[in-house]
């Protein structure tokens, strides 16, 4: 059956991926399914369809999209084409999410594009342990998926840092951090993590799991 998708949030990129999630409420489980028949034949990505999202949902889905982009950029399967998608998505989402939370037309439009580009990237290379941990958190505690991602992401970035080469310099630069070319490895890695924390804080995401479980 052909699928025509009309996304109403800017985060999951379900309209351009072959992944979907089934929640088993009785067993408190979330199951990630992959099916090539799940991908839509046409996606109508219209930011006006997302304008009714409340601030909290906008923030959560936006941080989900940023997590897609960052995890996709540093995953083992990353390569030149996926890197192009993910870096551009990081750049767009980082500058647009604050405005989208305030429901500005420009922020909504850019978030619609940024999350879509992130989906184009990660659907080709996969994600990482942030999503692996966020799914059971959501299943067990009913934590919004994007909120769980946003809280876990900085810690996982710190853990993964030794295996990422100079990619955190690229992430920091894409997120608007100045002077990254003159930073040491430790400095630009910290700058990338701090930029993620700052964005999450600015859009009202809790800083710690203790606040949500």
Pin down the residues of each PLM region.
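Proline/glycine-rich low-complexity loops and linkers
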Residues: 1-19
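Acidic, glycine-rich active-site loops and adjacent beta-strand->loop/helix elements
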Residues: 8-11, 49, 154-157
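Glycine-rich phosphate/pyrophosphate-binding beta-alpha loops
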Residues: 11, 116-149
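Carboxylate- and glycine-rich phosphate/diphosphate-binding segment that chelates Mg2+/Mn2+
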Residues: 16-125
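A general structural signal for well-ordered alpha-helical segments in protein cores
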Residues: 63, 90, 130, 149-150, ...
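Short helix-capping/linker segments at secondary-structure and domain boundaries
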Residues: 73-79, 125-127, 159-166, 207
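Gly/Pro-rich interdomain helix-loop hinge
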Residues: 140-213
